A protein has these predicted regions:
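Flexible assembly/topogenesis modules
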Residues: 1-142
C-alpha cells in the first residue's frame, strides 16, 4: 500500500489531482483537513460526501463514494478540521484518465459552504493506493 499526501486547491466543490499515468488500482481516503464547514440546523446536513468520478460505479457503491464524513454541530474554528479514517475503505479505479476528480458536497447534495466564504481554498488529504491483484483461481486453495 502506498500513501500519498496532497495539498490541493478546491475550486467550488471539485478537486483535480494529476497522475503520471492512468490509474488501474484501488484507492482509499486516509485523512482530510478541511476548513470549517458552515453548520446547518440538522445533523443530516452537516455530513459531507467525498466522491471520486474515476471510482467504478458498482451495485454497492453507485454514487462512487470514497467516504461520508459526519461533522455534527461544530463550533467556529480558526484552523482546519481534521478527519482520519479508523479503517481505510478501498475502491477500484479503472480509468484511462491521468487525473482523479474528487467532489465534496453535503450528503443532502447541497454545496458545502466553508468559512470564511471564498471560491477557492487549499485542502490537505492523504490517499492510499494499492495495485489491483489479479484474481486467484479457486484451485489455488485445493
Amino acid at each position: 500500500m502506498k500513501f500519498v499526501n496532497y495539498r490541493v486547491l478546491l475550486m467550488g466543490d471539485t478537486i483535480t489531482i494529476p497522475l503520471d499515468r492512468p490509474c488501474k488500482c484501488n484507492i482509499g481516503l486516509v485523512d482530510i483537513w478541511i476548513p470549517e464547514i458552515l453548520s446547518r440546523d440538522d445533523e443530516f446536513n452537516n455530513a459531507i460526501d467525498i466522491t471520486c468520478e474515476q471510482v467504478d460505479s458498482s451495485f454497492d457503491n453507485p454514487e462512487r463514494l470514497l467516504r461520508r464524513i459526519p461533522f455534527g454541530k461544530i463550533k467556529p474554528k480558526k484552523y482546519y478540521q481534521t478527519w482520519t479514517a479508523e479503517h481505510i475503505h478501498m475502491y477500484t479505479v479503472d480509468s484511462n484518465d491521468k487525473f482523479l476528480t474528487i467532489k465534496i458536497r453535503r450528503t443532502s447534495n447541497q454545496r458545502a459552504l466553508f468559512y470564511p466564504i471564498q471560491e477557492d481554498r487549499q485542502l490537505f488529504l492523504t490517499l492510499a493506493f494499492t495495485d489491483i491483484d489479479t484474481p486467484e483461481s479457486w484451485t489455488t486453495y485445493i
